[in-house]
């Protein structure tokens, strides 16, 4: 996605929203995720993402996207990237979740709004409200991925 003045703020909103899902996914053995990506077992990855997301969000809010990738080198730690689709009411976010040994990160590829405002700040606020409304439980401050 082309970076804009609103990109960083929206990435922070999405990162906060998927923090608990990233935490759940980081409980999996990286070798298992890598093998699922390598052998293109995308249905299995979709099930894992759905299982992690259903603990926190209404069904269909957060889904596995089109694929992913991994970095695995002899002298390094594995890094796994999963494409995600976030579909809270009125918005769609295409993002990449990066899982590493001690952290997780988010990159937004595209955000679309069903009824976009001409004011980008209003769109950003709508995204935050929409993701909050899609949650089952309130987020906890300080929860780390």
UniProtKB/Swiss-Prot annotation:
Protein name from the UniProt record: Uncharacterized protein Atu0565
Organism superkingdom: Bacteria
InterPro entries registered for this protein in UniProt: UCP034217
Record organism: Agrobacterium fabrum (strain C58 / ATCC 33970)
Family statement: To R.meliloti R00649.
